[in-house]
Amino acid sequence: MIGLVGKKIGMTRIFTEEGTSIPVTVIELKENRITQVKNINTDLYCAIQVTTGIKKSNRLNKPQSGHFLKSGVTPGRGLWEFRTDKNNNFKIGQSITINIFNNVKKVDITGISKGKGFSGTVKRWNFHTQDATHGNSLSHRVPGSIGQNQTPGRVFKGKKMAGQLGNTRVTVQSLNIVRIDEHRNLLLVKGAVPGATGSDLIVKPAIKV
């Protein structure tokens, strides 16, 4: 299922005819250019590789320069892939625009969430705090026990503990499309999406309709 790579512009709100305020995220979806078409014979799977935006040639390393030169496509700010079926008719250099969402009501959006740094268990995992008084000394926000005793004699993998919060790949599913502005290449979706303003987002038609 193909989609588009865009940029998060920010959040605002729009009003319906009834006067209801709807919070929306504005996403800029400029044309995506196909740089490579992968197939079963050469790559063992079917996909298209796309780029968007413009990147100066002096900012590219040699592998990137060679890749864009071979495809004959203007260098973009990154490379992304979308899986396709065997009978796709995509060609290198072809452009994919915001028009693919004309008959779509909901989308799934993937991005890198805002990094919050090293965080404790209360902030990271919503742990309850311990008693503020009643004999509690310096243990108000500590996680408590992280295991048992000699059996099993280890801490289980995946144990919720303090660590880095955010800066991970996150997907928000089934966001309603509120408006599409084809002239300015803008997509307005209801609600919030992952990432900071200016970050890259992958927008696909929703899997769960």
From Swiss-Prot:
Its subunit composition reads: Part of the 50S ribosomal subunit. Forms a cluster with proteins L14 and L19.
* A GO MF term: structural constituent of ribosome
Biological process (GO) annotations? translation
Belongs to which family? Belongs to the universal ribosomal protein uL3 family.
Q: Which InterPro entries match?
A: Ribosomal_uL3, Ribosomal_uL3_bac/org-type, Ribosomal_uL3_CS, Transl_B-barrel_sf
Signal peptide interval: none
The gene coding this protein? rplC
Keywords carried by this UniProt record: Methylation, Ribonucleoprotein, Ribosomal protein, RNA-binding, rRNA-binding
Q: What is this protein called?
A: Large ribosomal subunit protein uL3
Modifications made to the protein after synthesis: Methylated by PrmB.
Q: Which HAMAP family match?
A: Ribosomal_uL3_B
**Record function comment:** One of the primary rRNA binding proteins, it binds directly near the 3'-end of the 23S rRNA, where it nucleates assembly of the 50S subunit.
Modified-residue entries (N5-methylglutamine), positions: 150
Q: Which PANTHER family match?
A: 50S RIBOSOMAL PROTEIN L3, LARGE RIBOSOMAL SUBUNIT PROTEIN UL3C
Q: Source organism's superkingdom? A: Bacteria
One term under GO cellular component: cytosolic large ribosomal subunit
